[in-house]
Regions:
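Conserved alpha/beta-hydrolase
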Residues: 46-68
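Hydrolase active-site cap/lid region
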Residues: 113-151
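Acidic catalytic loop of the alpha/beta-hydrolase fold
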Residues: 177-181, 209
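Catalytic histidine-centered segment of alpha/beta-hydrolase-like enzymes
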Residues: 206-218
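Short alpha-helix in the alpha/beta-hydrolase fold that links the catalytic acid
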Residues: 42, 168, 182-191
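Short beta-strand/loop motif that positions the catalytic acidic residue
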Residues: 165-167, 172-174, 178
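Alpha/beta-hydrolase active-site loop
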Residues: 73-89
Length: 231
């Protein structure tokens, strides 16, 4: 049964979410850029939570999916603020953050902001610093559909230029042939993380979406393995 659609307010923005009660740690899914909580990976993870009795939270950033607002007004800082509020207000205890593409970038920031609560991270085609390596400048970003405000916000939240002071287990899954997020970004992220427990799984022939059945299976097996100590 699909969890009921609900909303919470932050700064006058109505953020849509679905929460499935269960035992912890709570799984929290963060969608990618221009995506939402009803995508295939989110639904497969929700089904996994149902089968295993896990609590799970998924939500839409403002301007996406069922949340209020205009997509073009969104910035990485704004969506980080909403993501932090969702974790703080809607979950208790330890969480496992699962981020797709841009959502992976946000999970890194959440782990830095709430190290005492984040038990593990899973980055699916994680796109850390994509405003940095994806575009030469604000004008290039704008031509590709990324607003100037979003680009500036992303530049202020870059992580890959130094050590990322995260110590929890981190799992990165990345497609060998990802056309949107170069595989090198996954290697850079792995090297930048301070944690000694970091694993990168390169999926042969995989693209960016990683939504094929065998790719979904790899994601679910990764999440399940991280949860084993909590069984």
């Amino acid at each position: 049964m699909t969890p009921e659609l609900a909303h919470f307010d932050i700064g006058g923005r109505e953020i849509a979410y679905r929460y499935r009660p269960g035992r912890g740690p709570t799984l929290v899914f963060l969608p990618g850029y221009a995506s939402d909580m009803e995508g295939n990976k989110a639904l497969e993870l929700d089904a996994f939570a149902t089968r295993t009795g896990r609590a799970m939270l998924r939500f839409d950033y403002s301007g996406t999916g069922s949340s209020a607002g205009r997509f073009e007004d969104g910035t990485l800082a704004l969506w980080l603020e909403e993501s932090l509020a969702a974790v703080d207000r809607l979950t208790d205890g330890p969480v496992v953050l699962i981020g797709s593409s841009m959502g992976g970038w946000l999970t890194l920031h959440l782990a830095l902001l709430r190290p005492e609560r984040v038990q593990a991270l899973v980055l699916i085609a994680g796109a850390a610093d994509f405003t940095d390596w994806g575009f030469e400048d604000a004008e290039t970003a704008e031509r590709k559909g990324i607003g100037r405000a979003f680009w500036r916000s992303g530049q202020e939240l870059r992580l890959l230029s130094g050590e990322i002071a995260i110590d929890c287990p981190v799992r990165l899954l990345h497609g060998e042939n990802d056309p949107d997020v170069p595989l090198d970004v996954a290697f850079r992220t792995m090297r930048a993380l301070r944690s000694a427990d970091v694993q990168l799984n390169v999926l042969k022939g995989g693209g960016h979406r990683l939504s094929e059945p065998h790719e979904i299976d790899a994601i679910l097996r990764t999440v399940a393995a991280l949860l084993e100590p909590a069984l």
